[in-house]
Amino acid sequence: LAGRDVYLTIDETLQHIAETSLERVVRESGAERAMAILMRPETGEILAMAAVPFFNPNRYQDSPAGHWRNRAVTDVFEPGSTFKVITAAAAVEEGVVSEEERIDCGQGSIQVGSQVIRDHKVFDVLTFREVMQFSSNVGMIRISQRLGKERMEQYVHAFGFGEPTEVNLPAESRGILRPAAGWSSRTLASIAFGQEIGVTPLQMVTAVNAIAASGYLMRPQLVREIRAPSGELFSKFEPEPVRRVVSRETAARLTEILVGVVDGGTGTRAAVAGYTVAGKTGTAQKASPSGGYSKTDYIASFVGFVPAYRPEITALILLDSPTGDHTGARAASVFAEIVEPSLHYLGVPPELDSGVSSVIAHWPRQKTLASELSSGNQEWSSVTPAVAGPSIPGGIRVPALYGLPARDAVARAIGMRLAPKLLGSGWVVGQEPPAGRLVGPGTRFLLILGPSGATGFEDAVRIADDTRRGGQSPVPQRPRETPAPSEASF
């Protein structure tokens, strides 16, 4: 690939949104680390892959060696209750349970071999739908026993566990999955609710994405195309369905069940105004160094997709050892925080009449890993905000965006319900209308980009014209040292 330009599926603005939210939740929760992966359901394209703490590959020596790896593909964790999505999909596909069938949850406990497994709450009888909604371990164990270990193993493999996703990132783990022949008397029950199996974050989001993709397991895609410096196309990577894992009908039924988790179950904090969300929480005990499971350390996670019936984003949020609230509900709130502005940025129209719709958050300008690698060097087309908030008396006052990198300027403009059009690459050196003018929602907002420190409208237009004549710059560029622009205050 020497000398060639690699175009990624990563969207710099979505990466920035994810990194900003993860930094905040790590700071506030005291979590050891946090991860977020956003995927486009129908193609498997990875739109964002963020981890905190992260490191700058230009200055890797400034970070501990443990931060150098891409934990989304190298680190293995027991998923906990998010894995119930896989158990439920297998059970529905095999016809061993129906949504309204009543399941005996044994007053919150069940004997498996010589051990007693308990629920987080005492449940007597729940429908299968409620077993998922309220995340009953006992109920899922009952259902897994109907499947049996051979069929359970078949579906776990079909959803991509126990093998690399082949995303072509270095050191990708295949996870941990023992052959069914070596399962103990408890293994089937444990796997049903996400124990005794090790998965990578990318495996988990890819598996649940199969439900969003109408039953197809899609190969995760990180590279869109490779071009020569002249612009000649060298390689183009198309979406790759790996296999169908469940029928379209099963995927639709699972979607309805997962919508119930967010509407009135353990995942209510994942709700996004104006959109139907489908997803599942997970609260997984971490393994204890002395054996067994820790009583104090947990991995909180949420995986889901939105809009539920016409998905545009599948996302996984993972928080490692947060203090205080260590449940999947905490991860669900981060899911909503990341997904809501992402939907608006992508121009996904709301599907529900929920009164006043939210708009994209006013993301503060921060120096992120994405900005270090690309410095905002991308020529953009216009982006039209799909969601308008309430009318502002007297109109919208145009913000001053001078000095901001492209991604932050776009987020800020959409947050103000303006329609940005960008010319050139780099930082904002000119804008029209000017700052302070009152305009209506949806007004076209021209942002002219150039090198940090450039001034003057004429120079900005010349820079933009030169950029257009020279062609589009790939994102991200090869890592290089770039001085950061001065901090902007707004």
Regions found by a protein language model. Give the residues of each.
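Ligand-recognition elements built from short beta-strands and adjacent flexible loops
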Residues: 274, 307, 317-320, 329, ...
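Short, small/polar residue-rich loop motifs at catalytic or cofactor-binding pockets
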Residues: 30-34, 104, 220, 422, ...
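Short, charged, low-complexity patches
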Residues: 11, 15, 204, 327-340
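Extracytoplasmic/periplasmic proteins that interact with beta-lactams or build/remodel peptidoglycan
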Residues: 1-33, 55-58, 63-67, 237-241, ...
